[in-house]
């Protein structure tokens, strides 16, 4: 009975015809409304009082309201199933881009039987109809949201199937391995020894290496998509705001000789060597009785706790231990992988040391005001993040890396069961779980709530 209800729900969903504005809100020369579903062509013909133009050919039409009055005019394109984005009948109406006329046209389509599309519903239908896998569907949203040329190019590669191909190649190896293991379990009379010839162990290690290679590439794609949260911290007048301006390439923050000028956090989106960065300037860390400045310091510490990377700026001319401030305010977050020490105002020093390391921490000497050493700092930031994108880098998300991490965990368990315990059934179960985890990436094995969360983050018209 449950299966019948699930089938009916799926059937009813795709018997509806959906409509949405596909262009951004606001005024524009052209506004596009998209229809998809079994009644798309019928609804469009009622709207235009004419038959549709030939498939994939633009035709000029007038759009009529319920009283027969012309609401707008423009182009109509018809994409019959299955040769459309969604795999269903799709009609695109290209009229004028004013919000009033676009909303009026959309309301008219609803009167004619269309339903309002949910966020990401067009892409969801494309996924369900086999036009896209989950990685390609996500790449559409990533291409729209790309903040750099490199991110856009990587999103296009994922949309074209580069990431999916890598995952599917690993899955083929994993399925091949499972077949060998299952054969050894199902035909015990053949007395197949799991370790006799080392073949299964070699296949398992090959799969693990393949997953690791994809993980390395995906990490670069994740950095391109999600970027790095970088926080600048230090004492008042250490040159934090000057450093933000130098990295951003403009005077974003106010710079004065008065200590405590910066009292709130200041965020700036920039790109360093192609790596998207959210750069945050913070209030100077010191003891103060000023209530407003105290609140700024509290917010600064909160930003420090959440940062991917912290740039701790200190004044070289003071000769102080740069780590003393860190020990006082955020000792629990004092990790070499999250911290770069910045010795600033080197232009005021004669014969200043070019330190590359201070204790266990990376160190860079700069003059933010004079733009000395800034490129070396930029290189240090991207190197610290492990950012080394290749020409074939594809876009990736945190959930992809999480799925691969779980895949590796199950493969490690399978190896342990194989080598230590010779437990064939447990090896097979771990390999099954590894395949399920890896299949989540392309959507071959995905829970409904995961799909809803992914497509729910899309634009309405996608």
From Swiss-Prot:
Instruction: List locations, semicolon-separated.
Output: Cytoplasm
Summarize where GTP binds, as residue positions: 237-242, 256-262, 281-284
Q: Which HAMAP family match?
A: GTPase_MnmE
Protein name in UniProt = tRNA modification GTPase MnmE
User: Gene for this protein?
Assistant: mnmE
Q: Which PROSITE patterns match?
A: G_TRME (PS51709)
Report which superkingdom the organism of origin falls in: Bacteria
Q: How is the cofactor bound here?
A: Binds 1 potassium ion per subunit.
Task: Write down the CDD domains for this protein, in alphabetical order.
Answer: trmE (cd04164), TrmE_N (cd14858)
Which residues belong to any copy of the TrmE-type G domain? Answer: 227-386
Q: Which residues bind Mg(2+)?
A: 241, 262
Q: Which organism is it from?
A: Acinetobacter baylyi (strain ATCC 33305 / BD413 / ADP1)
Q: Highest lineage ranks of the organism?
A: Bacteria, Pseudomonadati, Pseudomonadota, Gammaproteobacteria, Moraxellales
Tell me which EC number(s) this protein carries.
Answer: 3.6.-.-
Q: Got a GO cellular component term for this one?
A: cytosol
- Top enzyme class, one word, equals hydrolase
